[in-house]
Regions:
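Short His-Asn-centered micro-motif
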Residues: 10-12, 40-41, 152
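A short, glycine/small-residue-rich beta-strand->loop->alpha-helix junction that serves as a flexible
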Residues: 11-21, 159-160
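General "foldedness" signal
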Residues: 23, 34, 51-53
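A short beta-strand-loop structural module common to alpha/beta enzyme folds
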Residues: 35-45
Length: 160
């Protein structure tokens, strides 16, 4: 019998930094288990930046190679949602079952924020860079390197 399992990364509504966690975990899991991977919910309209009249609107269209446009995203959402397969939210990197959809759709909690990727940092970094569009990478190369950058929002972490 043929194993028709695959990985589905349903990108959560969050900022780009928080979206990178399920993306990175899904990419790593799919590579480790040699499974096909599908990404949905990448194109998200965020009303807040418009209401607050922010200069940047937080649109990350075409940043990644898996972003194939809104129509394809909607088509894939419908197709994946109605597949009659067992759905499994991934909590580790254990063994895989036949005909299972491995779903990555959550941002890690504050207490284990980096636990899922810390031991495989270099591989995860490599996988992320492989999935960034070449145009974006070229733009990044032209920028001067920052000396230091830090962004912490207290809404993302519990005060200890």
């Amino acid at each position: 019998m043929v194993n028709k399992s695959f990985v589905w990364c349903k990108i959560p509504r969050a900022g780009l930094g928080n979206q990178l966690f399920p993306i990175a975990n899904a990419l790593f899991f799919a590579k480790e288990k040699n499974l096909p991977i599908y990404f949905t919910h990448y194109r998200q309209f965020k009303l807040g930046p418009y209401l607050r009249r922010e200069r940047t609107k937080r649109k990350y269209d075409n940043f990644f190679t898996f972003d194939r446009g809104l129509i394809y995203d909607i088509y894939l959402r419908i197709l994946l949602r109605y597949k009659s397969r067992k759905m499994s939210k991934v909590k580790g990197c254990g063994s895989i079952s036949a005909n299972t959809v491995y779903l990555f759709d959550e941002i890690p909690s504050w207490e284990g924020y980096f636990n899922s990727i810390v031991n495989d940092r270099e591989e995860v970094k490599k996988l992320l860079f492989q999935n960034i569009n070449s145009d974006i990478l070229e733009q990044v190369k032209t920028l001067s390197k920052p000396i230091f950058s830090l962004h912490i929002r207290l809404g993302d972490f519990q005060i200890i």
